[in-house]
């Protein structure tokens, strides 16, 4: 049941405590605020002027590369993928091998979870979840953000089938597991292309595999319609810290990618393509490639008329992995740009501050 105005906060209130009580502590999220029919965005969500998005920033008639993966190991496709990773950091793929029926079930399960009553979703909040690997929340890191983001999320870190069956929300668990299993072949193919063929790494052995794809995390993101979308963001400027991310988005749109080699502040809208998946390079692979592949700033704008969902699957190094350039990349005398960094330290650094563009990767720069 949707909350009523009488049951929650005075929307004219200035206190974060009232907003926090409703959004986070009671589990309504920003979806609950949207469902109240509020006409004015609470000031806690107002982004600084320099961070707000304008249509004037969009590079018209531009798009990220679209790649057909049906012949994924052909020289032409290998070149297209590696070029996209180097010059864009983002690309869309079709004929990727993940069944379209699986993708549809994932989207339906995402809507089912966020349609749950607040008290059910709140069972997975930071304060109530029985395990750290499953977390429902809003924004990014609210306790350190000066301006909150207009987004609710469910984050699930995969450890084992046993833990998943015990702790992941039953209303979406099976669909997310099916999606993760269906993505394994795609993940291996992308690693073969980007690392073995692109970076000339001899092989992905039992030592290197955990360094590249040692863990998985899946997020369910919900961006409700917003009364003043021009004042806030769904997600602020950032790059992912993953090796790479596989993103499923719905047909609404809203994801924008910063254009590389651009001296101005221009962005490219990632137009939804039915049946496609979006691949974006993460900081970890930028470090391991010594900067050849690029993790690119991206953001999600708020929408004033429609709700939006997305489901990123983060393919991450194992927390105990050491991030550093591959020796093969440096074999011809190339100087390392990045120092060795423990993956868990890098991740901890990312999650202790608000989204701030590409500044996280500076943590790994050589002194």
UniProtKB/Swiss-Prot annotation:
Requisite cofactors: L-ascorbate; Fe(2+)
MF-aspect GO terms: 2-oxoglutarate-dependent dioxygenase activity; 4-coumaroyl 2'-hydroxylase activity; metal ion binding
Fe2OG dioxygenase domain mapped to chain residues: 207-317
Keywords assigned by UniProt, alphabetized: Dioxygenase, Iron, Metal-binding, Oxidoreductase
Biochemical pathway: Phenylpropanoid metabolism
Chain positions recorded as 2-oxoglutarate binding sites: 223, 308, 310
Pfam families for the chain: 2OG-FeII_Oxy, DIOX_N
GO annotation (BP), single: coumarin biosynthetic process
Domain of life: Eukaryota
EC number of the protein: 1.14.11.61, 1.14.11.62
Induction: Induced by UV-B in leaves and petioles, but not in roots and stems.
Catalytic activity entry: (E)-4-coumaroyl-CoA + 2-oxoglutarate + O2 = (E)-2,4-dihydroxycinnamoyl-CoA + succinate + CO2; (E)-feruloyl-CoA + 2-oxoglutarate + O2 = (E)-6-hydroxyferuloyl-CoA + succinate + CO2
Cofactor annotation comment: Binds 1 Fe(2+) ion per subunit.
Binding site for Fe cation: 238, 240, 298
Activity regulation, per record: Repressed by the competitive inhibitor psoralen, but not by umbelliferone, xanthotoxin, bergapten and isopimpinellin.
PANTHER family, per database record: FERULOYL COA ORTHO-HYDROXYLASE 1-RELATED (PTHR10209:SF243), OXIDOREDUCTASE, 2OG-FE II OXYGENASE FAMILY PROTEIN (PTHR10209)
Homology family: Belongs to the iron/ascorbate-dependent oxidoreductase family.
Protein role: 2-oxoglutarate (OG)- and Fe(II)-dependent dioxygenase (2OGD) involved in scopoletin and umbelliferone biosynthesis. Converts feruloyl CoA into 6'-hydroxyferuloyl CoA, and p-coumaroyl CoA into 2,4-dihydroxycinnamoyl-CoA. Has no activity with cinnamic acid, caffeic acid, p-coumaric acid, ferulic acid, cinnamoyl-CoA and caffeoyl-CoA.
Name of this protein: Bi-functional coumaroyl CoA and feruloyl CoA ortho-hydroxylase Diox4
The organism of origin for this protein: Ruta graveolens (Common rue)
Taxonomic lineage from the root: Eukaryota, Viridiplantae, Streptophyta, Embryophyta, Tracheophyta
């Amino acid at each position: 049941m949707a909350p009523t105005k009488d049951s929650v906060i005075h929307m004219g209130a200035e206190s974060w405590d009232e907003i926090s009580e409703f959004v986070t502590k009671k589990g309504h999220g920003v979806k609950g605020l949207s469902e109240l029919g509020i006409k004015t965005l609470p000031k806690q969500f107002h982004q600084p002027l320099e961070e707000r998005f304008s249509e004037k920033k969009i590079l018209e008639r531009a798009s990220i590369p679209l790649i057909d993966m049906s012949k994924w190991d052909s020289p032409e496709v290998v070149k297209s993928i590696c070029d996209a990773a180097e010059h864009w950091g983002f690309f869309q793929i079709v004929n990727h091998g993940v069944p379209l029926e699986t993708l549809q079930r994932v989207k339906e399960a995402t809507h089912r979870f966020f349609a749950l009553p607040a008290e059910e979703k709140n069972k997975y909040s930071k304060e109530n979840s029985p395990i750290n690997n499953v977390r429902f929340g809003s924004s990014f890191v609210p306790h350190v953000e000066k301006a909150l983001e207009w987004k609710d999320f469910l984050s699930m870190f995969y450890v084992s089938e046993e833990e998943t069956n015990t702790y992941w929300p039953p209303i979406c668990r099976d669909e997310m597991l099916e999606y993760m299993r269906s993505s394994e072949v795609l993940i291996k193919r992308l690693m073969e292309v980007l690392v073995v063929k692109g970076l000339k790494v001899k092989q992905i052995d039992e030592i290197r595999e955990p360094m590249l794809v040692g863990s998985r995390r899946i997020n369910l993101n919900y961006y409700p319609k917003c009364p003043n979308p021009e004042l806030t963001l769904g997600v602020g400027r950032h790059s992912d810290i993953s090796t790479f991310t596989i993103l499923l988005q719905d047909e609404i749109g809203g994801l924008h990618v910063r254009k590389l080699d651009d001296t101005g502040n221009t962005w490219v809208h990632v137009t939804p393509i039915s049946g496609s998946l979006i691949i974006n390079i993460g900081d970890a692979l930028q470090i391991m490639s010594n900067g050849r592949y690029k993790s690119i700033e991206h953001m999600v704008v708020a929408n004033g008329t429609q709700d939006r969902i997305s489901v990123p699957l983060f393919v991450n190094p194992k927390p105990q992995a050491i991030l550093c350039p591959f020796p093969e990349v440096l074999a011809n005398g190339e100087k390392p740009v990045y120092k060795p960094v423990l993956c868990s330290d890098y991740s901890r650094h990312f999650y202790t501050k608000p989204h701030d563009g590409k500044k996280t990767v500076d943590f790994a720069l050589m002194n």
